[in-house]
Structures are given as structure tokens and as C-alpha cells.
Amino acid sequence: MAKKHPQKPANLIAQNKKAGHDYNILETFEAGLVLTGTEIKSVRKGKISLRDGFARVRRGEAYLENVHISPYEQGNQFNHDPLRNRKLLLHKKEIAKIGALTKDKGITIVPLRVYLKHGFAKVLIGVGEGKREYDKRETLKRKEQDREMARALRKR
């Protein structure tokens, strides 16, 4: 089983709120990111978007794809491609486990959060299955009912 991760890391840079709405997250993993110099500078400034990102396992390695890291303003000719594929640093057993989980149809790997831990950029990835439209509506109804119950309990 994957390790338990803190709910809100101290140095949270970006969060993919849409992933929780669109996917049932089955398991989470913490992975390091291989970044160039201008990329880490942009990430530290918070210039990263996880919205359309996903991860893929290829030839025993995991890659983060379609995550946009804006070019660094002072990067001149050494700037990076904003949408390049970035390697994820995971243990071999974790990569094998993620690969086995994603063999099933409808299972996807999505980035949930990017944060700094001891000076290194980390990404929390979640393995999840896509929600159908009626599942999303059901989740919203349940959240609304919970809010109403909490409101009623506070008024007592």
C-alpha cells in the first residue's frame, strides 16, 4: 500500500482541484520531478498548470505529460519547452504497481499537487478511474447535504 501523505504540504505550489471532481482516486504516490534550471525557477514562482496533465508509464519509466510550466522571464535562449514530457522519479516497485493498475481500461494517472519538499519539487500523483456524469452529480449532492447538516448543527 502507498504511504500516507500529508493533506496540505507546507510549500504547496499548485493543486489540481479538477482531478478530484473528474476522477475517483484509488491510490496516491509521491514522485520527484526531473526539471531543468529554468523550469524549477518557474515552478518556484508558481507558474505551473496541472489542469490537463497526466502521467504515463513507458519502458519501465514514468513520465508526466501535458503539464504546462511557463517559460522563465530571465531565461533567454536557455528557456525550456513549456509542454515537454518530464520524467517522474519513483521506485521500481512503485512504477510496476502503477503500470499494473493502469492496464485496466478507464484507469488513469493524474497529477494532484506540486510542492517543494526539502528544496526539491515533488508531485503527488493519483491513480484513478474517471467519474461518469451522474457520479459527479451524486458527489455534488452529497457535499451539499453535508454542508446543510453542518450548518444545522452549528445553529443548535
Curated annotation (Swiss-Prot):
Q: List, alphabetically, the InterPro entries matched.
A: SmpB, SsrA-bd_prot, SsrA-bd_prot_CS
Write out the annotated subcellular location. Answer: Cytoplasm
> What does the entry give for GO biological process?
trans-translation
GO CC aspect terms: cytosol
- Do the record's keywords include RNA-binding? yes
The record's listing under Gene3D superfamilies reads:
2.40.280.10
Main subcellular location? cytoplasm
Which Pfam families does this UniProt record tie to the protein? Answer: SmpB (PF01668)
Listed NCBIfam families = PRK05422.1, smpB
Q: Which family does the UniProt entry place this protein in?
A: Belongs to the SmpB family.
| Function per UniProt | Required for rescue of stalled ribosomes mediated by trans-translation. Binds to transfer-messenger RNA (tmRNA), required for stable association of tmRNA with ribosomes. tmRNA and SmpB together mimic tRNA shape, replacing the anticodon stem-loop with SmpB. tmRNA is encoded by the ssrA gene; the 2 termini fold to resemble tRNA(Ala) and it encodes a 'tag peptide', a short internal open reading frame. During trans-translation Ala-aminoacylated tmRNA acts like a tRNA, entering the A-site of stalled ribosomes, displacing the stalled mRNA.
The protein here is known as SsrA-binding protein
Protein species of origin: Latilactobacillus sakei subsp. sakei (strain 23K) (Lactobacillus sakei subsp. sakei)
Q: Which gene encodes it?
A: smpB
